[in-house]
Regions:
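Compositionally biased, intrinsically disordered/low-complexity regions enriched for serine, proline
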Residues: 12, 24-25, 306
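Sec-dependent signal peptide recognition
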Residues: 1-8
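Domain-terminus/edge residues, biased toward the C-terminal soluble/receptor-binding domains
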Residues: 151-155, 163-168, 172-345
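Active-site-adjacent loops and short helices of periplasmic peptidoglycan-processing enzymes
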Residues: 18-184, 196-200
Length: 345
């Protein structure tokens, strides 16, 4: 059951989504400390465990590092062909690396591939310095963007995801961040499907082992530290639907792969997503007092999708909550009522 606000549809606003929760569909039994599965089109949570608990994100931090790099490219503050110098500090970055040489020049395109495919901490550092001048200033940008996205359980201390006090996120926040990358930067999202990258004559393979194993999986990012455990945020598209899954502290590389696969299969096999209303559909005529017209049409400003368990679409019911007449003047785009979605019985 869910409530969603109706708006006066003649003003373009963000499209609305709905969630219809049905406890009769049991999620797979996973050992991961936290997990989350979301249908991207309807923004519906299909399975979750500890999704709002603050966790150490490890290299999933690099989702935000990449996001800010994509934003800089979009704003033409960077270009993929631009070459930047590798600092001594970046070269000394511990952990996973793309094996940059200090003082050498490297293109932004190669840095992005090293960041995404090889999870290079050195690549993250060079990108941070190229965008903000220093990693410290880049972290300020990361946290500012997290606040703008309303990632309420996220705080960054570095651009790499190396363990640090007060460096944390949550499964829900990371899925929201990944969703924004997919929606805003489709031309760069394709980098997450690369299975191999060769730099400095060293070939490294994408640690997301679902790539190639499941033809529907086309990204996104792994993470690991001793304290964070094995993490994987994955996304797949099948029959026009896109799902995003995340597992935190799965126990092993093999486990994070298999548990992510279980989540994605569960979402595709047990649920369907359909359009309930199209943009501009008149859902209801709202009475208006003391206006130039006695009624105003109300609906959703964007296509309105609903995800339901397989076989239950015909049982779905949409009811308007009791609404009082509006008093003119009425502001276009204002929320004017609630739509309740339920199943019969």
């Amino acid at each position: 059951m869910t409530l969603r606000a109706l708006i006066l549809f003649f003003l373009a606003c963000l499209p609305a989504q709905a969630q219809v929760f049905d406890e009769s569909v049991s999620p797979p039994n996973l050992r991961s400390r936290a997990f989350l599965l979301v249908d991207l089109q309807s923004d519906t949570v299909l399975a979750q465990k500890n999704s709002d608990v603050r966790i150490e994100p490890a290299s999933l931090t690099k989702l935000m590092t990449a996001y800010l790099a994509f934003e800089a490219l979009y704003q033409k503050r960077l270009s993929t062909e631009q070459r930047v110098v590798v600092s001594e500090k970046a070269w000394q970055a511990p952990g996973s690396r793309m094996f940059l040489e200090p003082g050498s020049e490297v293109s932004i395109e190669d840095l992005l591939k090293g960041l995404i495919v090889q999870s290079g901490n050195d690549a993250a550092m060079v990108l941070a310095e190229a965008i903000a001048g220093s990693e410290d200033q880049f972290v300020v940008m990361m946290n500012r963007e997290a606040q703008r996205m309303r990632l309420s359980d996220t705080k960054f201390v570095n651009a790499t995801g190396l363990p640090a006090p007060e460096h944390y996120s949550s499964a829900r926040d990371l899925v929201r961040l990944a969703s924004d990358i997919i929606a805003r930067f489709p031309e760069y999202f394709t980098l997450y499907s690369l299975r191999e990258f060769v730099y400095n004559e060293i070939a490294q393979y994408n640690r997301n082992k679902l790539l190639g194993r499941d033809p529907h999986v086309d990204g996104m990012k792994t993470g690991f530290t001793d304290s964070a455990g094995f993490c994987l945020l994955a996304t797949a598209q099948r029959d026009g639907r896109r799902l995003i899954s995340i597992v935190i502290d799965a126990g092993s590389d093999k486990a994070r792969t298999s548990e992510s696969q279980k989540l994605l299969n569960f979402g595709f096999e047990h649920f369907e997503t359909r359009k309930l209303y199209s943009k501009g559909d008149v859902v209801h005529e709202i009475p208006v007092w003391k206006g130039s017209t006695s009624q105003l049409p109300a609906g959703f400003s964007g296509d309105f999708y609903v995800t339901v368990p397989n076989g239950r679409w015909q049982e779905l019911r949409a009811e308007l909550e009791s609404m009082q007449p509006l008093l003119a003047p009425v502001r276009a785009g204002q929320s004017i009522g609630m739509l309740r979605l339920t199943f019969d019985g």
